[in-house]
């Protein structure tokens, strides 16, 4: 797929031009509104810095969380503007609205090297509307913010699987380019699918089988092994006839898991032991049991030491590794060993020459929470959902639109 990128745009020249950048700045906040993981802000900075250094007038569109009924003060991008400014080493203006009077006035007042962050793009319901006309109307207002000669740079990989106004529709109206982050993510995913070093090991965790069913079915015919951990492993174990106590369970997926185990028995790898406890709490005492001996009334919150050893041995021989989803409730120290053990095994394999990709989301958060150097992996993705959909073989609207011919005048 041929897509114009940031280097192409910089070669054309952006001095004094308006550039609308769709970034993924959807970072987690604690109860006080403090950012707890700035990974996505850090990852978004290189594209923005390159444009600012080239004297562009930069307008950034981004979202935070999922506002339900318009503007929500708890989901304002105000703390993001401060953190982004620290990363860029310059002041980041924050508009008081998305495409209203304040945003337009601030955008018109920009000079080369200035940056304006629009308020949470999802405060405008048209951003995520299923109605094409609604989304296009918002996209046209975004075009007005960058004016004549304006261009669009797509750099929010975490949202390219969404057909949304600031991701998809805007690229049909403005000359469009892939930012550094999006270009790098696509290069890595293409390497995962087209030039895989064998053996190819996939590690999947997280809560629900239903969330990962598509990628399991797709990768089961491509990977040499798929390790199953996290909350989703209990539905697979139940499909094998084991009692899982009060562990997370998707009853309606048991038959599906049974079918997967029958079809891909030589690929799927499940835990052999678990760390269980009475309640979902950090201070609830842990107990290690075999998968066939989970007591009634107890729930699994992590894979056990035997499983860690088994999975680590498998990963030590891998040539390519894709990891998406923690092995347990890593936020609770007593139940973080599984995730840490798998992460360290992937790091060791990477050190021996394996190509390793951490598929964004909770896996990336776990790596940072455990203070494992990000450079110890070949690549850490910023888009868990987008990565999974790509590996499922789905078309990513925000990428597909970048491959189209550049639009010409008359968009307004």
Curated annotation (Swiss-Prot):
Subcellular localization, as worded in the UniProt entry: Cytoplasm
GO MF annotation list: ADP binding; ATP binding; phosphoglycerate kinase activity
EC number(s) on file: 2.7.2.3
The keyword Lipid metabolism appears for this protein: no
Keyword Phosphoprotein part of the UniProt annotation: no
Pathway: Carbohydrate degradation; glycolysis; pyruvate from D-glyceraldehyde 3-phosphate: step 2/5
Enzymatic reactions: (2R)-3-phosphoglycerate + ATP = (2R)-3-phospho-glyceroyl phosphate + ADP
A GO CC term assigned to this protein in UniProt: extracellular region
Binding, substrate: 24-26, 40, 63-66, 122, 162
GO biological process terms, semicolon-separated: gluconeogenesis; glycolytic process
Keyword annotations of the record: ATP-binding, Cytoplasm, Glycolysis, Kinase, Nucleotide-binding, Transferase
Membrane-spanning parts: none
Stretches assigned to coiled coil: none
Assembly mode: Monomer.
Family: Belongs to the phosphoglycerate kinase family.
Protein name per the record: Phosphoglycerate kinase
Taxonomic lineage of the native organism: Bacteria, Bacillati, Actinomycetota, Actinomycetes, Mycobacteriales
């Amino acid at each position: 797929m041929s897509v114009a990128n940031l280097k192409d745009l910089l070669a054309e020249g952006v001095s004094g031009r308006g550039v609308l950048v769709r970034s993924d700045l959807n970072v987690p906040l604690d109860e006080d509104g403090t950012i707890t993981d700035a990974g996505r802000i850090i990852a978004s900075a290189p594209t923005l810095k390159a444009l600012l250094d080239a004297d562009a007038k930069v307008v950034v569109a981004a979202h935070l969380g999922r506002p339900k009924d318009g503007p929500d003060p708890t989901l304002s991008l105000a703390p993001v503007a401060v953190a982004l400014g620290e990363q860029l080493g310059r002041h980041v203006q924050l508009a008081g609205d998305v495409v209203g009077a304040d945003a337009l006035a601030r955008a018109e007042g920009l000079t080369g090297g200035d940056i304006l962050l629009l308020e949470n793009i999802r405060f405008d319901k048209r951003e995520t509307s299923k109605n094409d006309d609604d989304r296009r109307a918002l996209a046209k207002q975004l075009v007005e913010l960058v004016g004549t000669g304006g261009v669009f740079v797509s750099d929010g990989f975490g949202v390219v699987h969404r057909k949304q106004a600031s991701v998809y529709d805007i690229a049909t109206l403005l000359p469009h380019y892939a930012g550094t982050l999006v270009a790098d993510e696509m290069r890595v995913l293409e390497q995962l699918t087209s030039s895989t070093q064998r053996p190819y090991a996939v590690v999947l965790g997280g809560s629900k089988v239903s969330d990962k069913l598509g990628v399991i079915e797709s990768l089961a015919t491509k990977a040499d092994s798929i390790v199953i951990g996290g909350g989703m492993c209990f539905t697979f174990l139940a499909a094998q006839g084991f009692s899982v106590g009060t562990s997370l369970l998707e009853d309606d997926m048991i038959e599906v898991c049974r079918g997967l185990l029958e079809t891909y028995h030589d690929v799927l790898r499940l835990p052999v032991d678990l760390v269980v406890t009475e309640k979902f709490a950090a201070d609830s005492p842990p107990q290690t049991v075999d998968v066939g001996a989970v007591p009634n009334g107890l729930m699994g919150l992590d894979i056990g030491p035997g499983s860690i050893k088994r999975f680590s041995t498998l990963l030590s021989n891998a040539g390519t590794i894709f990891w998406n989803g923690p092995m347990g409730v890593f936020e609770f120290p007593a139940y973080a060993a599984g995730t840490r053990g798998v992460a360290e095994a992937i790091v060791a394999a990477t050190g021996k020459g394996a190509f390793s990709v951490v598929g964004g989301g909770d896996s990336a958060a776990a790596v940072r929470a455990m203070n494992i150097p990000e450079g110890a992996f070949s690549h850490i993705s910023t888009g868990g959902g987008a990565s999974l959909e790509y590996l499922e073989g789905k078309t990513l609207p925000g990428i597909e639109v970048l491959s189209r011919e550049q639009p010409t005048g008359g968009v307004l």
